[in-house]
């Protein structure tokens, strides 16, 4: 279970200061404006590539695949946002929404009616079960690594 907590918290963000912090990171991008594509493979103990460099103004299509056996999240955020999101993810685990290898989508939908944070529907992140793939398009408003 400890491994699950470590891996699920690898890339996290917060919705509390979402709007203000997102201005520093960027915004949802448009497919018609994509300037490059980056494939991200999420394993249980690491992600590939290890680092990603982007420049201000770039619109990047991330093709993200969970190649591990645990649920993983990929998101674009500041370190401060990652730290604030940890308790939200823990709440999702405590409420039975996030299981080690599965997302209980019915419970997520039900719980999101009481707490919108439980919906986990953010344009800067994808939450994937093992073997799932997703795409995220993001326009960066500053240089980032």
Name each model feature, range by range.
Residues 1-7:
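Positively charged n-region of N-terminal signal peptides that target proteins for export
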Residues 85-108:
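Extracellular/luminal beta-rich ligand-recognition
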